[in-house]
Swiss-Prot record:
It comes from Homo sapiens (Human). InterPro entries: CP2 (IPR007604), TF_CP2-like (IPR040167). Belongs to the grh/CP2 family. Grainyhead subfamily. The lineage of its organism: Eukaryota, Metazoa, Chordata, Craniata, Vertebrata. This is Grainyhead-like protein 1 homolog. GO terms for biological process: desmosome organization; epidermis development; establishment of skin barrier; positive regulation of transcription by RNA polymerase II; regulation of DNA-templated transcription; regulation of keratinocyte differentiation; regulation of transcription by RNA polymerase II. Keywords: Activator, Developmental protein, DNA-binding, Nucleus, Phosphoprotein, Transcription, Transcription regulation. GO terms for molecular function: chromatin DNA binding; DNA binding; DNA-binding transcription activator activity, RNA polymerase II-specific; DNA-binding transcription factor activity; DNA-binding transcription factor activity, RNA polymerase II-specific; DNA-binding transcription factor binding; identical protein binding; protein homodimerization activity. Changing residue 427 to Q: Loss of activity as transcriptional activator. Nearly abolishes affinity for target DNA. Causes steric hindrance that impedes DNA-binding by neighboring residues. Changing residue 9 to A: Increases activity as transcriptional activator.
Length: 618
């Protein structure tokens, strides 16, 4: 028979994890209760429990004492099923095993369940509950709910409400050494505030009705929790007692030692001023709550790169990098460089110039790592238009774990920079200081940092997006020159597209994964140097441009033959007459290194079926 009633009892069960303080384990219920019987339930203990308004728990505890005084053999042999479930299909549908009631258990007014290692959430019944005939047998529940979780993620205790009752069960007649799950009985209401750590009354004390609560806690122990004791045990567990599995990637910090702008707008990233080509230190460290603890696997790999601050498509970014690269004096000019300082190389290893705008290295998170980085591009170097506002740049740091073979970094942070040339960073700071001193306090709309409080250390701002892959600029003809030392980052040929590549491979399990077999290394490809000469005949006023296909004497002869219709096989000698009047024989060395974009007057003389050519320098 079911009926509604107001007395309900919530039950809280903490999962038994090895992270919590250890207690002695018992191999069976009888061993656990054997220690209980060594400290019998005295009248004083019952009185204390009654004073605190928990007569039900006192009665249930006495019932369990009586139950476990009977030897197991007698309990197993005399146990008889006495409960019939009127809705077996419903119980089967909810995956709750049908259990039989023992005479000793059914005689009590309250039932308490011995719980094994199954982790439970906190369950708070609410709404209509099934009535329990305390003088008769238990009836099958109308609704059965089983709640379990894997971990207890936070210190604060959170309650859950369900619209229906929960399974009411009793221990099975036959003892099972490893039960898969147990069902909790509750039939009295308890204030949910008792489950919060700050709800304990000042005079409340933790009561230990038996010796089990004072012993060490160990995985596998069987414990009985009474609702009155739960509220007493929970406040005694501080937040420090909970050991969290910290998420990788939230415990790194990078700092840049450089001048910061005095005009920082609220909500904007800190602007740092750098000089082009000047090296600045970047410090990398792990910020862990457990300082002094050395990690067994402590190697990580970080990639420092210069990227565009604004959201641009991959094609736009590669176009900007290509334009910048085409305007450099040498094709080997990189966007970012790392200094060979001893202070830096004592803390990092396996340095790789994986791209023209990125450098990677390995470091130990047990120690701080310091690298010295220079940026070789201005914000205005990516456009041919004069006077336009430059593109904002970021220094971005991606850190990969050797434990994770994914191409996704465990941490990403960035710092917004503005690069000046010829000590422009210092001039910019002095200009801001002058403007700050002239401006009155009443006119200040943007908060200014006083010069005496200005810090020269910028902390990188964490980046939430870890899925977007950065664009790395790798010219095809110079990919073989990107390595430093004996290691190069293995990038599949299909990952190289056009003028650049997206970083598609993260750090790997061991350092050997970074090595490339000799057979797969790309051969060094040197771009041939081109030579351009401006030549005119003595009778002409306009010069002709001679572009040599190869910077050699043979290339010069082919260019003259094509331009002036001189048979190539009949050209005998070619001379160069310098401005000082010196006449020298032209050779490959002079053509390649000393003739590019020079102006000459060409004189062609025919003698004996061959031609003599003289290039007089103008």
């Amino acid at each position: 028979m079911t009926q509604e009633y107001d007395n309900k009892r919530p039950v809280l069960v903490l999962q038994n994890e090895a992270l919590y303080p250890q207690r002695r384990s018992y191999t069976s219920e009888d061993e656990a209760w054997k220690s209980f019987l060594e400290n019998p339930l005295t009248a004083a203990t019952k009185a204390m429990m009654s004073i605190n308004g928990d007569e039900d728990s006192a009665a249930a505890l006495g019932l369990l004492y009586d139950y476990y005084k009977v030897p197991r053999e007698r309990r197993s042999s005399t146990a008889k099923p006495e409960v019939e479930h009127p809705e077996p299909d419903h119980s089967k549908r909810n995956s709750i095993p049908i259990v039989t009631e023992q005479p000793l258990i059914s005689a009590g007014e309250n039932r308490v369940q011995v719980l094994k290692n199954v982790p439970f959430n906190i369950v708070l019944p609410h709404g209509n509950q099934l009535g329990i005939d305390k003088r008769g047998h238990l009836t099958a529940p109308d609704t059965t709910v089983t709640v379990s979780i894997a971990t207890m993620p936070t210190h604060s205790i959170k309650t859950e409400t369900q619209p229906h009752g929960f399974a009411v069960g009793i221990p099975p007649a036959v003892y099972h050494p490893e039960p898969t799950e147990r069902v909790v009985v509750f039939d009295r209401n308890l204030n949910t505030d008792q489950f919060s750590s700050g709800a304990q009354a000042p005079n409340a004390q933790r009561r230990t009705p038996d010796s089990t609560f004072s012993e060490t806690f160990k995985e596998g122990v069987q414990e009985v929790f009474f609702p009155s004791d739960l509220s007493l045990r929970m406040p005694g567990m501080n937040s420090e007692d909970y050991v969290f599995d910290s998420v990788s990637g939230n415990n790194f910090e990078y700092t840049l030692e450089a001048s910061k702008s005095l005009r920082q707008k609220p909500g904007d990233s800190t602007m740092t001023y750098l000089n082009k080509g000047q090296f600045y230190p970047i410090t990398l460290k792990e910020v862990s709550s457990s300082e002094g603890i050395h990690h067994p696997i402590s190697k990580v790999r970080s990639v420092i790169m210069v990227v565009f601050a604004e959201d641009k498509s991959r094609e736009d970014q590669l176009r900007h990098w290509k334009y910048w690269h085409s305007r450099q004096h040498t094709a080997k000019q990189r966007c970012i460089d790392i200094a060979d300082y001893k202070e830096s190389f004592n803390t990092i290893s396996n340095i790789e110039e994986i791209a023209y705008n990125a450098i990677s290295f390995t470091w130990d998170i047990n120690d701080e790592a310091k690298v010295f980085i220079s940026v070789n591009c201005l914000s205005t170097d990516f456009s041919s238009q004069k006077g336009v506002k430059g593109l904002p740049l970021n220094i971005q740091v991606d850190t990969y774990s050797y434990n994770n073979r994914s191409n996704k970094p465990v941490h990403r942070a960035y710092c917004q920079i503005k690069v000046f040339c010829d000590k422009g960073a210092e001039r910019k700071i002095r200009d801001e200081e002058r403007k700050q001193s002239k401006r009155k306090v009443s006119d200040v709309k943007v908060p200014l940092l006083p010069s005496h409080k200005r810090m020269d250390i910028t902390v990188f701002k964490p980046f939430i997006d870890l899925d977007t892959q950065p664009v790395l600029f790798i010219p095809d003809v110079h990919f073989a020159n990107l390595q430093r030392g004996t290691h190069v980052l293995p990038i599949a040929s299909e990952e190289l597209e056009g003028e650049g590549s997206v970083l598609k491979r993260g750090p790997y399990g061991t350092e050997d994964d970074f090595a490339v077999p000799p057979s797969t290394k790309l051969a060094r490809i040197e771009e041939p140097k081109r030579v351009l000469l401006y030549v005119r005949k003595e009778s002409e006023e306009v010069f002709d441009a001679l572009m040599l296909k190869t910077p050699s004497l043979k290339g010069l002869m082919e260019a003259i033959s094509d331009k002036y219709d001189v048979p190539h096989d009949k050209i005998g000698k070619i001379f160069k007459k310098c401005k000082k009047g010196i006449l020298v024989n032209m050779d490959d060395n002079i053509v390649k290194h000393y003739s590019n974009e020079d102006t000459f007057q060409l004189q062609i003389e025919e003698a004996g079926g061959s031609y003599k050519l003289t290039l007089t320098e103008i």
